[in-house]
Amino acid sequence: MLSATQPVSENLPAHGCRHVAIIMDGNGRWAKKQGKIRAFGHKAGAKSVRRAVSFAANNGIDALTLYAFSSENWNRPAQEVSALMELFVWALDSEVKSLHRHNVRLRIIGDISRFNSRLQERIRKSEALTAHNTGLTLNIAANYGGRWDIVQGVRQLAEQVQAGVLRPDQIDEERLGQQICMHELAPVDLVIRTGGEHRISNFLLWQIAYAELYFTDVLWPDFDEQDFEGALHAFANRERRFGGTEPGDDKA
C-alpha cells in the first residue's frame, strides 16, 4: 500500500500538524462523471486512500483518520452498501500486510457490531497484526458517528456511576474525553473535506473542537499528494488561538 513519496516541498513551512482527519467525499460524483456506477467511484477512492496514507507516513504526521462509512450510510441503496462492505473486506485483505511492513498501526473506530461476522473477524485480525507498530496510526471510521461516539462515552460513565465507582459530581470534560474514540492520540489539528461540501457530517464532533477546517472542491478519487500538501500549507499559515485572542490584542 505504501510507496516512497517525496516529503513536502522545501518551501512549505514546518506544518506542525500531528493529526489529520479527512472526510472523503465525492466518489459517487466522480463515478457519474465517468459514466460508471457509484461502486466504481468507491474503488477509485481506495487508490486515493493509499496515496494519502503514504503521504502522511512520509511527512511527519502522527495520525490519519479517514471517514470511510458513517452510521447514516446504511440509508444508502442496499446494492451500494453491499459493494462498500465487500470493498472494506478486500481492502483489509490486500493492504494490511503492506501497512504492517511499513510500521503503520491500523485501528477501526465505530460500532463494528453491525457488520457481519466475516468483516468483524477481518477487523480484529488486522488490528492485532499492526497493534505494536510505532509509525503512523491510521484510524478508519466505519459505522461511525460523532453523536454515537459521545453517547457511548456517556453510557460508559453512567455504568461506572451505577456500579458505585464514580460519583456524578466527578464527571467532567476530562473523564468524558477518556471514553471517546482516539482519546489516547493527539487531538485532531486539521480536518480536510473533499468534494466541495462545507459541513462536518457528524464526524468527530468531540475531537475537532479546535481543529482547523479545510474544504476543497477536488473529488476524493482525484485527491493527490499535491492537494494534501496544499492543505498542510494552508494549515501552516493559519494562526490557531484555541478560543483565545491574538497575542498583544487586549480587545475582545
From Swiss-Prot:
Catalytic residues of the enzyme: 25, 73 (proton acceptor)
Enzyme nomenclature, EC number: 2.5.1.31
Binding site for substrate: 26-30, 38, 42, 70-72, 74, 76, 193, 199-201
Keywords: Cell shape, Cell wall biogenesis/degradation, Magnesium, Metal-binding, Peptidoglycan synthesis, Transferase
SUPFAM superfamilies per record: Undecaprenyl diphosphate synthase
Stored CDD domains: Cis_IPPS
Subunit structure: Homodimer.
Protein name from the UniProt record: Ditrans,polycis-undecaprenyl-diphosphate synthase ((2E,6E)-farnesyl-diphosphate specific)
PANTHER family hit by this protein: DEHYDRODOLICHYL DIPHOSPHATE SYNTHASE 2, DEHYDRODOLICHYL DIPHOSPHATE SYNTHASE FAMILY MEMBER
Pfam families documented for this protein: Prenyltransf (PF01255)
PROSITE patterns, alphabetized: UPP_SYNTHASE
Gene: uppS
Gene Ontology annotations for the cellular component aspect, listed alphabetically: cytosol
GO biological process, one term: polyprenol biosynthetic process
